[in-house]
């Protein structure tokens, strides 16, 4: 059975034109092979680890979709954002960290790639996850300006002491996943 999956290759060309059901600013919905598929941008997600201070950087974020369901204004999430046209994951990562966390990472900083993962079965988007162990020489701090949106203006980066990792209460599965990865990373390094 595994041989079947190891030989899978991405579609090289469209056999037929995809039917667009909806097209919006951030995503579209297409019909393909009897499925409704959400077509959107890939995104970077990360947790910076500030080594000297034993802290991680998270986001206390205003997320309208979560508020719609829970009524709660703010949620604990990750530094994250879409990979824009012309960007590779590392470029998008450094831009998002500056916009959302106010950290300017030195250009020659080497990031370790983790395996990109699909967001859901119904979406073409992939998350490119990163854990960034940073020494003070790897970055300098600036004021996080966000992307100009209302949600960004109502959100902020927060530094969390590593000793409180087990008491954090994330609202989404990808934040939970990344916190588990950070704990795994820290246990390997201790």
Question: What residue spans do the PLM features occupy?
Answer:
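Active-site-adjacent beta-strand/loop module that shapes the phosphate/pyrophosphate-binding cleft
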Residues: 26-33, 52, 118-142
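The catalytic Nudix box helix
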Residues: 77-115, 130
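Conserved Nudix-box catalytic region and its N-terminal flanking loop in Nudix hydrolases
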Residues: 38-40, 47, 52-95, 151
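Residues that flank catalytic or metal-binding motifs in active/ligand-binding sites
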Residues: 28, 42, 74, 79, ...
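Nudix hydrolase/Nudix homology domain
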Residues: 2-3, 7-8, 72-75, 85, ...
């Amino acid at each position: 059975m595994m041989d079947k999956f190891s030989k899978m290759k991405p579609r090289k060309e469209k056999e037929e034109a995809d039917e667009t059901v909806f097209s919006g600013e951030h995503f579209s919905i297409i019909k393909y092979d009897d499925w409704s598929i959400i077509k959107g941008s890939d995104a970077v997600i990360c947790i910076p680890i500030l080594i000297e201070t034993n802290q991680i950087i998270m986001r206390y974020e205003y997320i309208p979709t979560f508020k719609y369901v829970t009524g709660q204004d703010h949620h604990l999430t990750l530094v994250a954002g879409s990979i824009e046209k012309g960007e590779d994951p590392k470029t998008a990562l450094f831009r998002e960290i500056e916009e959302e966390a106010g950290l300017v990472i030195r250009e020659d900083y080497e990031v370790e790639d983790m395996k990109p993962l699909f967001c859901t079965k119904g979406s073409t988007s992939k998350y490119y996850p990163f854990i960034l162990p940073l020494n003070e020489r790897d970055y300098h701090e600036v004021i996080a300006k966000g992307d100009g949106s209302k949600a960004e203006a109502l959100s902020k980066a927060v530094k969390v002491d590593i000793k409180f990792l087990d008491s954090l209460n994330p609202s989404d599965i990808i934040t939970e996943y990344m916190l588990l990865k950070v704990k795994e990373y820290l246990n390997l390094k201790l």
